[in-house]
């Protein structure tokens, strides 16, 4: 299992928590972005071409079923969920086959509103509550994934 991070807009504290979890569980953590981003010790940084969606494409092409991805990008999350990855965002939301289409529809609707000048003001704060929610979800998801991998290897 590898942990993939869409690093273009990933907050520093989330990068730190993710790298620490990877180190603790001896899992590779790969940050991908179209520019150099400082990453914590022990993690890898892949700098892709400086083109739109290049980091997303890299993660999609190199990840495998059972890996974990962290991204805010809903279309990327959809691709990865469909591929069989565990996918979460930096606020502690998990994307699944059951809910990803709802998130994608909401995202597309908000883009339509924005294009027509009707979008509400963004009030998304990012603080201790969101960091704690992310950290808790990351820990529980990694434990679940590793337990499943252990069970699968016994048969």
UniProtKB/Swiss-Prot annotation:
Stored InterPro entries: UPF0178
Similarity comment: Belongs to the UPF0178 family.
CDD domains from the UniProt entry: PIN_YqxD-like (cd18720)
Protein name: UPF0178 protein TDE_2151
């Amino acid at each position: 299992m590898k942990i993939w991070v869409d690093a273009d807009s990933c907050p520093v504290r989330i990068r730190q928590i993710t790298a620490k979890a990877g180190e603790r569980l001896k899992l590779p953590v790969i940050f991908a972005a179209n520019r150099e981003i400082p990453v914590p010790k022990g993690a890898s940084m892949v700098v892709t071409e400086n083109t739109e969606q290049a980091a997303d494409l890299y993660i999609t092409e190199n990840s495998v079923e059972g890996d974990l991805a962290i991204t805010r990008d809903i279309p990327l999350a959809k691709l990865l969920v469909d591929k069989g990855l565990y996918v979460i965002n930096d606020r502690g939301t998990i994307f699944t086959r059951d809910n990803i289409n709802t998130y994608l529809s909401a995202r597309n609707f908000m883009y339509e509103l924005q294009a027509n000048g009707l979008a509400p003001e963004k009030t998304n704060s990012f603080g201790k509550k969101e960091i704690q929610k992310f950290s808790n979800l990351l820990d529980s998801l990694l434990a679940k994934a590793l337990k499943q991998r252990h069970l699968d290897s016994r048969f």
